[in-house]
Amino acid sequence: MTNNNNSNSNQLLVPGVQQAINQMKEEIANEFGVNLGPDSTSRANGSVGGEITKRLVRQAQSQMNGYTK
């Protein structure tokens, strides 16, 4: 399933996850004081994307730690 809201070619592997990703993006942007959109800088947008990645990795690591115990 492709994300039709953006012009990238990233594919979402879990159906219905786009809404959760968008919510996380908005929450992080608010925390960082970033206004997302075409007029914001790539640095500001990138900081939000980087934080999303960090949080998703942290969540996955927590889940994996739970499975290995």
Swiss-Prot record:
The entry's keywords: DNA-binding, Sporulation
Q: Where is this site: Cleavage?
A: 27-28
Q: Name one GO molecular function term.
A: double-stranded DNA binding
Role: SASP are bound to spore DNA. They are double-stranded DNA-binding proteins that cause DNA to change to an a-like conformation. They protect the DNA backbone from chemical and enzymatic cleavage and are thus involved in dormant spore's high resistance to UV light.
User: What family name appears in the similarity comment?
Assistant: Belongs to the alpha/beta-type SASP family.
- Reproduce the miscellaneous comment text: SASP are degraded in the first minutes of spore germination and provide amino acids for both new protein synthesis and metabolism.
- Give the protein's recorded name: Small, acid-soluble spore protein 1
